[in-house]
Amino acid sequence: NWDPVGVPSAIDSAIIGAGTVTVSQSVYPASLIVSSGATLVFTNWTTKLYVAGDITIQDGGTMTVPPSFLEGQMSNRVNLACSNMTIEPFGLITVAGKGYWVTNGPGRGYLYQRGSGGGYGGTGGRPYPDGILPVGQRYGSLSAPLDPGSGAGHYPSTNYTIHAGSGGGAVRMQVSGTATVDGTISANGESSKGEYGAG
């Protein structure tokens, strides 16, 4: 779905015109446009988009990663470097809920009656009504986050796994010039999806 067809080189101005393009290794185009309705998916933690010029995510274009993952599985992040970055209104970079899966990660939530929240730059939320019980622990950096967030806990039964939320994913942007964000960058963890599950 690259336009023109083929993995872009350092002399190419790349356009994702429609559909979904998945990158599993680093690429080095001269510039990049993610068009309206098109999606660029990053897989592998080390995959990086090195763009000598500008990156533009148009209205309705998206950069993202695959769904949340378990401890020991391959993690993913949106990882890019460019001169200038523009995210137009309704353009989107989202890794929301695409960090560690439920009860996974260094700051994973615990299994209680209603579970506890997963941690990252801060500790996870305490379970109600058992406010003295442990919660997902803090790790990483609050001011310069680099890692995925951990998944929340739930009632200790696999029947309630789907009620808890996964952690937020990771986005790293190195922009040497100007970053103009009129759209959205989202790395939120998931909220609770039902009774006895935390977010």
Which residues does each PLM region occupy?
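Extracellular beta-sheet-rich ligand-binding/adhesion modules
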Residues: 1-84, 157-160, 168-178
